[in-house]
Amino acid sequence: MKFGVVVFPGSNCDADCFHVLKNVFGRETVYIWHKEDNFDVDCIVLPGGFSYGDYLRAGAIARFSPVMKKVVEFANAGGLVIGICNGFQILLEAGLLPGAMLRNKSINFRCHDVYLRVENNNTPFTSKAHEGQVLKIPIAHGEGNYYCEPDTLKKLIANGQVVFRYCNSRGEVTEDANPNGSLYNIAGIINEKGNVLGMMPHPERCSENILGGEDGRVIWESIIAYLERGANRG
Amino acid sequence: MAIARVIVELKPGVLDPQGEAIKNSLHALGYEEVKKVRVGKFITLEVEGNDLKEIEERVKEMADKLLANVVIEKFTVQVEG
């Protein structure tokens, strides 16, 4: 199995994702420069950062990078794509996931640990977690206030596409636990087919105890388990 | 050469934390009469060509594709020769 971490101008969590996959999990991992449109991997990671300086809107310009044409094809063919933070924003702009990001309700850039509740463990990204499991994972963003039309939200909930919600340490979804004003406390969603995940928190920053926690591991472990089962590739 | 002006605004009802912060700051300065602030973008494009109608259509396409995110924003386009 081979992971590809896309590098946009302004990505800054690319090396962290690469490190976790390559050194912590010992999996073949390559960088994919945003101008490349010819690569062969089993899972694409769109890392966090500030692609193209987030000029115009977060993710808006990256969405038209040459690499994204291939990412869309890969996703449409069933390939696994995980977008973290800025990667999530890019997936929204690209239309691979529904909705959009607004600035944080508090207007502050929020950079601290949050708690997430796993709402759906029947996905390639969460199968190693149990439903209702509470994960402690850091966030770092100024535009993570997820928004979508009421009809879209209904569909997301009905289809089990809301994968992670912000909660408190006891797993209760409360307004106080919501760091950015996200609709329905949404921290991560999946597409209808279930092969594209976007999440604001950074699992790559908490996959080793030396960094203060290992709760992010479950996401990488789930992806690896899914690929090991030889599930379809894009 | 034509000048196209694109105004991008958040749709009504979509929360604008930036506008709220500016409103609070204006109140702190004593401008209590300000009841609402909405922040948008104003983008000026210099566009080659003479057919203003065609330019307007093209710029609307640009706004729809890139300059605005129509999930949360609306836009207006003005073109002058």
Curated annotation (Swiss-Prot), chain A:
Its EC number is 6.3.5.3, 3.5.1.2. The active site is at C85, H202, E204. Pathway: Purine metabolism; IMP biosynthesis via de novo pathway; 5-amino-1-(5-phospho-D-ribosyl)imidazole from N(2)-formyl-N(1)-(5-phospho-D-ribosyl)glycinamide: step 1/2. It comes from the Bacteria. It catalyses: N(2)-formyl-N(1)-(5-phospho-beta-D-ribosyl)glycinamide + L-glutamine + ATP + H2O = 2-formamido-N(1)-(5-O-phospho-beta-D-ribosyl)acetamidine + L-glutamate + ADP + phosphate + H(+); L-glutamine + H2O = L-glutamate + NH4(+). The keyword Coiled coil does not apply. Residues 3-233 form the Glutamine amidotransferase type-1 domain. SMART domains: GATase_5. One of its GO terms (cellular component) is cytoplasm. It is found in: Cytoplasm. The keyword Transmembrane helix does not apply. InterPro entries: Class_I_gatase-like, PRibForGlyAmidine_synth_PurQ. Part of the FGAM synthase complex composed of 1 PurL, 1 PurQ and 2 PurS subunits. This is Phosphoribosylformylglycinamidine synthase subunit PurQ. It comes from Carboxydothermus hydrogenoformans (strain ATCC BAA-161 / DSM 6008 / Z-2901).
